[in-house]
Swiss-Prot record:
HAMAP family: nitrobindin. Heme b binds at residues 181, 208. It catalyses: peroxynitrite = nitrate. It comes from Mycolicibacterium smegmatis (strain ATCC 700084 / mc(2)155). This is Peroxynitrite isomerase 2. Pathway: Nitrogen metabolism. The keyword Cell wall biogenesis/degradation does not apply. It is an enzyme of class 5 (isomerase). Homodimer. Heme-binding protein able to scavenge peroxynitrite and to protect free L-tyrosine against peroxynitrite-mediated nitration, by acting as a peroxynitrite isomerase that converts peroxynitrite to nitrate. Therefore, this protein likely plays a role in peroxynitrite sensing and in the detoxification of reactive nitrogen and oxygen species (RNS and ROS, respectively). Is able to bind nitric oxide (NO) in vitro, but may act as a sensor of peroxynitrite levels in vivo.
Length: 218
């Protein structure tokens, strides 16, 4: 028997669908700017517009779009809040383009200074830990702070994905960092939420970043 407190509110599913349709009236009409004079398919962050998504990426389909919002970070100086935009686009190839930009916020929630920035690609590859059985997510990132990071992971379900650092390469000017674990998921209201933990000087995973971003495009 279902406890009274767990009973879904009557009509809640219909309202969720209606709210999603209302959001799509704005987000579904937008896309990222592109040059239209190139001879190859343009990047698109809107599944309604442009070239079709590769079948090999269907398990990552919910990520496609432009996402904006705020989050919380922690570094050697303490906790801080940041704003962020993530662009997830494709050109019909077997990978997703990824670009994330963030900026620190002051105590009043206004822009303070540039923060982390990363760009890279998501794709599915033969799982290096289980080459005969499964496909793994591969995420290759270049960070503006001077290092390249390779993640492998897997979908947890149709709308969440977990990744762990497999390798790091740092430039001479790059920030010294440890590996990370990331969890992304589509949460209530269709937002994109994520948490990142990084290995600290003591060798353990500690909270580093978390954010909840609303769909702006797609």
């Amino acid at each position: 028997m279902t406890p009274a407190g767990d009973t879904p509110e009557r009509g809640s599913g219909d309202r969720a669908v209606a709210e999603a349709a209302e959001r799509a009236k704005a987000t579904g009409a937008r896309n990222i700017p592109v040059f239209d004079d190139l001879p190859l398919p343009a990047d698109t962050a809107n599944l309604r517009d442009g070239v079709s998504l590769s079948d090999s990426l269907l398990a990552l389909l919910p990520l496609v779009g432009v996402w904006r919002g705020e989050g919380e970070g922690r570094d050697a100086d303490g906790d801080y809040r940041f704003g962020q935009q993530i662009v997830v686009s494709h050109d019909g190839g077997d990978y997703l383009n990824w670009e994330a930009r963030s900026w620190r916020l002051d105590e009043s929630g206004e822009y303070h200074s540039p923060a982390l920035r990363e760009t890279g690609y998501w794709r599915f590859v033969t799982d290096p830990a289980d080459p005969h059985e499964t496909q793994a997510i591969e995420l290759l990132l270049a960070h503006s702070s001077g290092y390249i990071e390779l993640f492998y992971g897997r979908p947890l379900n149709q709308s969440s994905w977990e990744l762990v650092t497999d390798a790091l390469a740092r430039s001479k000017s790059g920030t010294l960092v440890g590996g990370a674990k990331r969890l992304y998921g589509i949460v209530e209201g269709g937002d994109l939420g994520y948490v990142e933990e990084r290995v600290d000087a003591d060798g353990g995973l500690v909270p580093h970043l978390s954010a909840r971003l609303s769909r702006y495009v797609g």
